[in-house]
Every structure is written in structure tokens, then in C-alpha cells.
Amino acid sequence: DEVLDGDDMVVLNYQIQSQSPLSEGASYEIATHLTMTSAAAGDWYLLFETNGNRAQAETDVTNNTLAVPITVTAPDLMVEIVTAPATAQTGQPITVSWRVANAGTAGTSAGPWQDGVYLSTDMALDGADTWVGSFTNHTALAPGGSYSRVQPVTVPIDLAAGSYYVLVRTDNTHVVLEGDGEDNNVTATGIVEITLSETADLVVEEITGPEFVTGVKVKN
């Protein structure tokens, strides 16, 4: 809103030194760049407050704030669909495909950002899940644009057998500034039943050698 209060985000503090003291009727101008790192896309106000620390004595401080309406745009990367085989074996590769779209109101830069692929026993990505691959995108994505990937990944040989989901998270290392658009970066497949692969079973079948062994002892 247009009212400055404790709920507002501070995006810049600018120390004025060269313009002090300011003569009666005089003015100064400041030009700078702001990066909106955490604001959600939509309509906002930029609030400008002069003498915010009240270091300058004034006859009236009620006119120290100005509100300027702005529209914030941001990309919003989302994983639209993920597919994988219904069955897999430990130690063996599977093919995973997914599509990433920009559902936001602004385009991305040319990147790069990574899409991460995980195996999970549930549909929520957390520290208990198993990472199986990361794949880099170097192409800018305009609003409404999308790209598709088809990649082989290998199921870890030491993974326990059971029911798993394949999870794909786009912008896996959070390099794309999406504002509030981070909560749709992960999508899961249906259940993938993973079984243990047959492993080698080495057996000593026979030992051969001479019946008698002669030893030599050397002493200095």
C-alpha cells in the first residue's frame, strides 16, 4: 500500500552527504538501480522517505514520504510433467523426460541453471532423497515458453528395493530470481517399482599347488 510501516521491505538506504546543508528552495536528484530479489510479481508501491533517521531537524516531517506505483514482473519456472518407466533395477539406467515452462510475466536470462533429478520414497523433495543427476539449461525462456529434456540416469546400485518417485526440480541451485514463484519448481512421476539387480556371487571352487613346499632361511 501507500503507507510506510514496519511491514514494508527496505530495498535501499542512501546516505546523503554532498547535499548537506541544503539551502532554502534548493533540491537534489539521485539516480540508482534497484534489484527486486524477493518481491512477488504484481502491483506494488516504491516508497521514498527522506531524512528517515531524523538527523535533520524539520518543521514538518509529514511530507517526507512519496509513494510511486510500479508493476513488478518476474519469471516463474515450473516443471509441467515428468515421465519415467514403471519399473527399474538397481545399478541400471532409466530414461527420464520432463518439460519446464515459464509461467511468469518476465523472461529469464540465458542462464545457466540446472534441473536436478532425484529418487524419493514420497512426492516431497528433502534431504533424505537420492540425487541421480543434474542437467544444465543455457537458453533464455520467454513468458509462456518451455523446453523438454530426455536424459538417462542410473539407479544407484546400493539403493534399497521398493516404491519410489522420480522428482525433477528446475532451477535446482536457485539462480533464477522468481519472487514467490519457487513453490512449483518440483514435480514427481507416478510410482516406480525398483528391484535389486542380480549381483555376482564369487565362489572358490578349487585350489592347486605343489604338495611339498621347501623354505630357505637366510641369516646375516
Role assignments for model-derived ranges:
Residues 1-220:
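Extracellular/luminal regions of secreted and cell-surface proteins that mediate adhesion/ECM remodeling
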